[in-house]
């Protein structure tokens, strides 16, 4: 109740109340990507990337001191974020950049032949690739909440409070040992193109000495091209954390009469940026020191419970997140190509519908069961394999 219905704390018995909770969460996140060039690594244009997420123990602490018409409460909990996930075969958005290399190699080889720099295209049969790819990410919001509840009448109470939110994100991964077939042999492309660059550079120097400026110019261009490919196929690593904090004002009200109880809570929009703390970023996606919008959207919750029996209660609830009012990281509009905040690709915000029942088995034991239906209402442009929402 400290989190879900803090205004209802006024109807507790006087005294100090403490709750320590632990939850476990295990999840497999499956991303299916279809891209024709993927067939060059495994023979299938559709690939499935599985992310294993596990949190064996997620703690939370809630405390209330109730005296007369007043109740003072506090809590510490993980209040948001997507948790942790490890993709041992990387992500499709990363592999897609590697998968087009064989086609580019064919075209580059044909250009070298047409320019008279090579007698035949060494990449004419290049149609396979391989890559060692890995990604691990975490997104967590830790919240410390403090507030006060006051009972106005025997039936009505109100709450006011604040939650300090600390965001901790982290991304770690690599793309390395990029290979492709030249003939029937798989070779490391970074080493191969570095060798071509060295060879063309020597030929350019020799042509310059021999008084063949046109040939020297062609070999210099080939050197630049091979050097560029060597750079594109070198091992790339990512190790970046993001942190930020913000304060959420919270208000609530609770109406309790007879067997009915109705609780309402509103959390205001939280202005928040996360700053990159980058150790390694060969991907150029997380420049050091850059701040990214990471607002926590305002939230309206309504809950209604009814006491069927003294030991049996049923409840329903509704949550609405005002996502469109929160500033978020940029995403690309898939129709126009424009980069803009992800909040512009959300229809009307997130809606959650809840229902549950709880039974007091005895004085010291209680069991409950419930369900939740979440509808995000996001457009395709909102989604990516590094940040997605699935209803």
Question: Where are the language model's segments positioned?
Answer:
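Outer-membrane beta-barrel porins/channels
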Residues: 57-58, 64-391
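N-terminal, post-signal peptide beta-strand-biased segments of exported outer-membrane/organellar beta-barrel
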Residues: 1-86, 100
């Amino acid at each position: 109740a400290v989190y879900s219905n803090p205004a209802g704390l006024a109807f507790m018995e006087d005294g100090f109340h403490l709750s320590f909770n632990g939850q476990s969460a295990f999840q497999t996140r499956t991303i299916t990507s279809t891209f024709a060039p993927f067939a060059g690594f495994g023979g299938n244009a559709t690939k499935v990337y599985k992310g294993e997420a596990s949190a064996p123990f997620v703690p939370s602490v809630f405390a209330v001191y109730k005296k007369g018409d007043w109740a003072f409460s506090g809590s510490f909990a993980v209040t948001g974020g997507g948790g942790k996930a490890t993709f041992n075969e990387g992500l499709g958005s990363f592999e897609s950049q590697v998968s087009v290399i064989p086609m580019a190699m064919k075209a580059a080889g044909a250009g070298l032949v047409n320019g008279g720099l090579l007698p035949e295209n060494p990449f004419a049969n290049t149609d396979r690739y391989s890559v060692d790819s890995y990604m691990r990410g975490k997104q967590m919001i830790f919240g410390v909440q403090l507030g006060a509840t006051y009972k106005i009448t025997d039936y009505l109470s109100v709450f006011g409070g604040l939650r300090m939110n600390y965001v901790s994100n982290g991304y770690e991964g690599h793309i390395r040992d990029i290979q492709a077939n030249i003939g029937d042999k798989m070779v490391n492309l970074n080493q191969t193109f570095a060798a071509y660059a060295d060879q063309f550079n020597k030929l350019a120097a020799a042509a310059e000495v021999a008084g063949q400026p046109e040939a020297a110019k062609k070999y210099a261009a080939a050197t630049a091209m091979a050097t560029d490919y060597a750079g594109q196929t070198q091992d790339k690593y990512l190790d970046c954390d993001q942190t930020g904090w913000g304060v959420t004002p919270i208000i609530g009200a609770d109406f309790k009469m007879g067997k009915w109880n109705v609780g309402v809570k509103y959390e205001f929009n939280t202005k928040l940026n996360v700053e990159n703390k980058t150790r390694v970023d060969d991907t150029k996606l997380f420049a050091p020191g850059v701040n990214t919008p990471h607002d926590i959207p305002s939230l309206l919750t309504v809950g209604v419970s009814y006491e069927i029996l003294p030991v049996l209660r049923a409840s329903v609830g509704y949550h609405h997140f005002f996502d469109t009012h929160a500033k978020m990281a940029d995403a690309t509009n898939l129709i126009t190509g424009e980069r803009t905040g992800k909040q512009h690709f959300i229809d009307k915000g997130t809606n959650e519908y809840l229902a549950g029942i709880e039974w007091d088995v005895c004085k010291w034991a209680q069991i409950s069961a419930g369900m939740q239906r979440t509808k995000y209402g996001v457009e395709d442009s909102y989604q990516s394999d590094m940040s997605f929402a699935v209803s």
